[in-house]
């Protein structure tokens, strides 16, 4: 029998009795898998296992994220939605609150739209995260921005979007992929430089999590937005 313990608001530790560390979210749309994830039923509630190998946010939770800014009722802007793996879990956590998810590639967006089926709080936006003004008529002020965009100007993208959409005192979460910034530089140097860009432009960094072994040369930063 699986054991369930709430780790963060609407994020659960799942003990399936095999010693493997797992987390999951309550299924907003029961019996629907988004990326082949395992479904677990406990006391008439279905949970979706959150695979850290396919989600940087999932990996950061497994690796010791101190605080989860995304909670029930959080309004979220998600940059770099891809096919919807992580946004679907974020939508589970937020429950009735909107998750605006931006993806640049039309082909991937088609897959993402399929994963949105039945999720009334998950809104797919075909757009360029570098140009927040393009979706400013759709997205309202949000509590959290999560970014997973493999571009050299990753930190700047977060700042641009924060200026448009993030409430003062809200949270920015960003998965920095060192190799997307500079292939030749030491990842630690890149992480420090990206952190500095954020700190100089309105964010107070409150957590940093290395997400190896799930992703190589990736660091997830959490910052509080002081506004600019």
UniProtKB/Swiss-Prot annotation:
It comes from the Archaea. Pfam families: Fibrillarin. InterPro entries: Fibrillarin (IPR000692), Fibrillarin_CS (IPR020813), SAM-dependent_MTases_sf (IPR029063). Its EC number is 2.1.1.-. S-adenosyl-L-methionine binds at residues 85-86, 103-104, 128-129, 148-151. It is an enzyme of class 2 (transferase). GO terms for molecular function: histone H2AQ104 methyltransferase activity; RNA binding; rRNA methyltransferase activity. GO terms for biological process: box C/D sno(s)RNA 3'-end processing; tRNA processing. Keywords: Methyltransferase, RNA-binding, rRNA processing, Transferase, tRNA processing. PANTHER family: FIBRILLARIN (PTHR10335:SF17), RRNA 2-O-METHYLTRANSFERASE FIBRILLARIN (PTHR10335). Belongs to the methyltransferase superfamily. Fibrillarin family. Involved in pre-rRNA and tRNA processing. Utilizes the methyl donor S-adenosyl-L-methionine to catalyze the site-specific 2'-hydroxyl methylation of ribose moieties in rRNA and tRNA. Site specificity is provided by a guide RNA that base pairs with the substrate. Methylation occurs at a characteristic distance from the sequence involved in base pairing with the guide RNA. This is Fibrillarin-like rRNA/tRNA 2'-O-methyltransferase. It comes from Methanococcus voltae.
């Amino acid at each position: 029998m699986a054991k369930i313990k709430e780790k963060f608001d609407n994020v659960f530790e799942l003990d399936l009795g095999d010693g493997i560390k797992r987390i999951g979210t309550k299924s907003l749309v029961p019996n629907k898998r988004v990326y082949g994830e395992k479904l677990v039923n406990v006391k008439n509630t279905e949970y979706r296992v959150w695979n850290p190998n396919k989600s940087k946010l999932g990996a950061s939770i497994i690796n010791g994220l101190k605080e989860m800014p995304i909670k029930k009722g959080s309004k979220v802007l998600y940059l770099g939605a891809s096919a919807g793996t992580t946004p679907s879990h974020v939508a589970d956590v937020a429950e009735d609150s909107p998750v605006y998810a931006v993806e640049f590639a039309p082909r991937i967006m088609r897959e993402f739209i399929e994963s949105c089926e039945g999720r009334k709080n998950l809104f797919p936006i075909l757009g360029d995260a570098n140009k927040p003004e393009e979706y400013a008529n759709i997205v309202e002020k949000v509590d959290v921005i999560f970014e997973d965009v493999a571009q050299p100007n990753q930190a700047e993208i977060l700042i641009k979007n924060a200026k448009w959409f993030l409430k003062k005192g809200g949270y920015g979460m960003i998965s920095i992929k060192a190799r997307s910034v500079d292939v030749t530089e030491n990842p630690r140097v890149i992480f420090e430089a990206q952190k500095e860009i954020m700190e100089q432009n309105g964010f107070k960094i409150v957590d940093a999590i290395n997400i190896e072994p799930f992703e190589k040369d990736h660091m997830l930063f959490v910052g509080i937005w002081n506004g600019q």
